C-alpha cells in the first residue's frame, strides 16, 4: 500500500472512448484516483454519482476525478451514459491496481478491486490514502481532505 509522500505510480490506461490516459497528463492538478469494484452495482453507483454531484466543487479546488475499475470501455461507456458521469473512467488492470494496493482478497467476495481512493497532489505525490471506503458520503470526505 502506498503511503502519504510516496510518488504515485505512473500508468497508461484506456478511457471510456479507448483513448490512452496517463497519470502524468494531470500534472499541475490534484487527482482523485478512486478504485471501485464494478460498474452499475449499488455501492459503485452511489459513489460515482456523488462524485458527479460534487464535480464543480472539485474543479474549484483544481482537482480532477479518475474512476478505476477493471471493466472494459463498453461497460464504462454504458455506466457513464446511464448516470451522466462527466469524468474519466479508466479501464484498469490488475497490475496497476496491485501497484496501488487496491487489489486483493476481499474475503467472501474473492479477489478483486478493494474500494480505495488516493488524493494525488499537483507534483504526482500521494497526499492522502482512503482505505475500506464507504460509498455513501465518500465524495464529501474527499472534498474535506482537499486543500
Residue ranges and their predicted role:
Residues 1-147:
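Chalcogenol-based redox active-site neighborhoods
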Amino acid at each position: 500500500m502506498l503511503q502519504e509522500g510516496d510518488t504515485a505510480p505512473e500508468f497508461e490506461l484506456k478511457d471510456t472512448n479507448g483513448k490512452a490516459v496517463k497519470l502524468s497528463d494531470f500534472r499541475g492538478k490534484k487527482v482523485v484516483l478512486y478504485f471501485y469494484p464494478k460498474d452499475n452495482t449499488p455501492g459503485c453507483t452511489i459513489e460515482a454519482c456523488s462524485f458527479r454531484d460534487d464535480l464543480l466543487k472539485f474543479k474549484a479546488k483544481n482537482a480532477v476525478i479518475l474512476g478505476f475499475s477493471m471493466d472494459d470501455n463498453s461497460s464504462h461507456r454504458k455506466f457513464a451514459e446511464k448516470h451522466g458521469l462527466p469524468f474519466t473512467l479508466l479501464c484498469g488492470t490488475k497490475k496497476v491496481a496491485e501497484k496501488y494496493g487496491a487489489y486483493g482478497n476481499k474475503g467472501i467476495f474473492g479477489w478483486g478491486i478493494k474500494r480505495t481512493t488516493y488524493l494525488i497532489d499537483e507534483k504526482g505525490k500521494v497526499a492522502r490514502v482512503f482505505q475500506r471506503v464507504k460509498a455513501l458520503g465518500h465524495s464529501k470526505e474527499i472534498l474535506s481532505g482537499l486543500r
